């Protein structure tokens, strides 16, 4: 019971350690403080194991106090050491290096960090072999000798960290990810579970006085973290079996013939297995998977979400395609055309779907009109379906303004809305009866009005371009050409028009 309670305590305190490090004192100070508490726990454990303490009847209280202190120290160390290690590597995303053999290789940041943590995990499991020595010392010399070795070894490591603390790269405390996640979840709960409402860009549009301590990319990371949590469904089964190493396996071994081997050695089955598998995975399995085009890099690789991505996109493509044909049929009805007149021009379709990511950027260039995420343009194709996040920034031409290139922002009403924009081919077919929608992507409207915003958040969108086949004519249809309305466009194929527009955009003659 004491052992199970101690394990539970050691998995509760990391939550507190993360909050203290991220919001108050930083990782290095948290690790140093937690290490000092951990060391106090080890010293208390050693003192409580002495014969004098046993004679005074304080061994059990001393044990409980030491476990309490060790648990606190574990919380501050376990949750911050891995993050601190990741912060130490500041190399570029990719760099080139010449080996001694003369071979030029590319150093990938993600793979480098993966190798760092593989090595770190390897050393952890090498350290896990200490019970081999500790159990022998405990059997030959008693608990006090075994506990003293732990305290001495930890003291050496603590001194090294303390002396070199100024050498570590550590992010300054800002706001707790845990608190921010809880706040974001609460906002999502109030909006039927939709995390898009927790984006600062959406909150700013709704209430300019409200300030959130995270950016839009935090919500994206939170979504990925939730997806990765699928694996935790299996954890109760795993831990139910794993905890037997520390309880039943040891008790069972104590009732068996050990031939001089301490029964406590059962806990080393786990690190032995890890030490065998880690080099195999790192040097053989993972490189083989990367050569086969199956990279194993990020935490979301432990979930089974990515294999479903391609079928999801294919299904989305088919749904968008059907939707576009329905919209074109409605346009036929609205223009009084014969059923199928426009839809037959859309076949065969050569549509495409794009996933667009606009990275975070500084706001000042947008304010000065020197930069836009997408300059004013019309789309190739017939119509465009746009699905965007809550960041905003899309603007369309205001034709009622009476002056050219006057734009108005497209306000988001629902996170699930679809925006339909008319494109060049439809304008050419209808001989300017339906004009292509001129649009641009710039700073969100709320950011323009706020002087306290220095950075524009990342923006993501999915765009479906409904396009006719490359050999389809995009000249004006006879139904739209009259004596009063002569053909405004030359008859040409969709491919020829795309080539013409490309030459115009790039200033190429001919």
UniProtKB/Swiss-Prot annotation:
One Pfam family cited in the UniProt record for this chain: PTR2
Keyword field contains rRNA-binding: no
Binding site for 2-oxoglutarate: 459
Glycosylation sites: 80, 421
Example of a GO MF term: transmembrane transporter activity
Membrane topology listed for this record: Multi-pass membrane protein
InterPro entries on file: IPNS-like_FE2OG_OXY (IPR044861), IPNS-like_sf (IPR027443), MFS_trans_sf (IPR036259), Oxoglu/Fe-dep_dioxygenase_dom (IPR005123), POT_fam (IPR000109), PTR2_symporter_CS (IPR018456)
Statement: the UniProt record of this protein carries the keyword Glycoprotein: yes
Single biological process term from Gene Ontology: oligopeptide transport
Predominant location: membrane
Fe2OG dioxygenase domain segment(s): 348-468
Induction (free text): Expression is down-regulated by ralstonins, lipopeptides produced by the plant pathogenic bacteria Ralstonia solanacearum. Expression is positively regulated by the imizoquins cluster-specific transcription regulator imqK.
Transmembrane intervals: 1-21, 31-51, 57-77, 116-136, 143-163, 231-251, 269-289
Coiled coil regions in record: none
Location relative to the cell: Membrane
UniProt keywords, alphabetically: Dioxygenase, Glycoprotein, Iron, Membrane, Metal-binding, Oxidoreductase, Transmembrane, Transmembrane helix
Binding site for Fe cation: 377, 379, 439
Gene Ontology cellular component terms for the protein in this record: membrane
Protein role: Peptide transporter; part of the gene cluster that mediates the biosynthesis of imizoquins A to D, tripeptide-derived alkaloids that serve a protective role against oxidative stress that are essential for normal germination.
Similarity section: Belongs to the major facilitator superfamily. Proton-dependent oligopeptide transporter (POT/PTR) (TC 2.A.17) family.
Record's protein name: Peptide transporter imqJ
């Amino acid at each position: 019971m004491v052992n199970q309670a101690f394990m539970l305590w050691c998995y509760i305190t990391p939550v507190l350690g993360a909050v203290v490090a991220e919001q108050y004192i930083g990782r290095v100070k948290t690790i140093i403080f937690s290490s000092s508490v951990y060391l106090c726990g080890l010293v208390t454990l050693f003192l409580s194991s002495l014969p004098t303490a046993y004679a005074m009847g304080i061994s059990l209280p001393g044990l409980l106090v030491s476990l309490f202190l060790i648990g606190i120290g574990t919380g501050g160390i376990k949750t911050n050491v891995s993050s601190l290690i990741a912060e130490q590597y500041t190399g570029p995303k990719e760099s080139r290096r010449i080996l001694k053999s003369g071979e030029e290789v590319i150093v990938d940041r993600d793979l480098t960090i993966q190798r760092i943590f593989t090595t770190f995990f390897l050393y952890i499991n090498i350290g896990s072999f200490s019970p081999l020595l500790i159990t022998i010392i405990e059997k030959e010399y008693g608990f006090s000798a075994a506990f003293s070795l732990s305290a001495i070894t930890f003291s050496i490591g603590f001194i090294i960290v303390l002396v070199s603390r100024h050498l570590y790269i550590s992010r300054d405390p800002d706001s707790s990810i845990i608190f921010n996640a809880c706040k974001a979840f609460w906002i999502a709960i109030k909006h039927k579970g939709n995390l898009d409402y927790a984006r600062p860009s959406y909150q700013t549009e709704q209430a300019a006085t409200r300030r959130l301590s995270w950016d839009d990319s935090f919500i994206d990371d939170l979504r990925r973290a939730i997806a990765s949590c699928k694996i935790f469904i299996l954890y109760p089964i795993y831990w139910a079996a794993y905890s037997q190493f520390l309880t039943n396996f040891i008790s069972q071994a104590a009732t068996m013939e050990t031939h001089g081997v301490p029964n406590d050695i059962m806990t080393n089955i786990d690190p032995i297995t890890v030490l065998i598998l880690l080099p195999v995975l790192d040097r053989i399995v993972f490189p083989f998977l990367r050569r086969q085009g199956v990279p194993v890099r990020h935490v979301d690789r432990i979930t089974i979400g990515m294999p479903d991505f391609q079928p999801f996109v294919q299904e989305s493509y088919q749904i968008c395609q059907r939707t576009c044909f329905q919209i074109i049929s409605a346009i036929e009805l609205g223009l009084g055309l014969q059923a199928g007149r426009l839809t037959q021009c859309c076949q065969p379709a050569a549509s495409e779907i794009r996933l667009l990511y606009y990275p975070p950027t500084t706001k000042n260039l947008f304010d000065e009109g020197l930069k836009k995420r997408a300059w004013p343009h019309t789309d190739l194709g017939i119509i465009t379906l746009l699905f965007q996040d809550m960041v905003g920034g899309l603007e369309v031409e205001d034709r009622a303004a009476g002056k050219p290139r006057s734009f108005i922002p497209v306000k988001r009403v629902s996170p699930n809305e679809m925006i339909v924009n008319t494109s060049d081919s439809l304008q050419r077919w209808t001989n300017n009866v339906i004009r292509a929608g001129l649009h641009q992507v710039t700073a969100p409207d709320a950011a323009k009005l706020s002087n306290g915003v220095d950075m524009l958040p990342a923006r993501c969108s999915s765009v479906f371009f409904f396009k006719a086949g490359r050999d389809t004519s995009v000249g004006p249809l006879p139904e739209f050409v009259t004596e009063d309305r002569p053909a405004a466009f030359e008859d040409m194929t969709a491919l020829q028009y795309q080539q013409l527009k490309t030459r115009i955009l790039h200033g190429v003659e001919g």
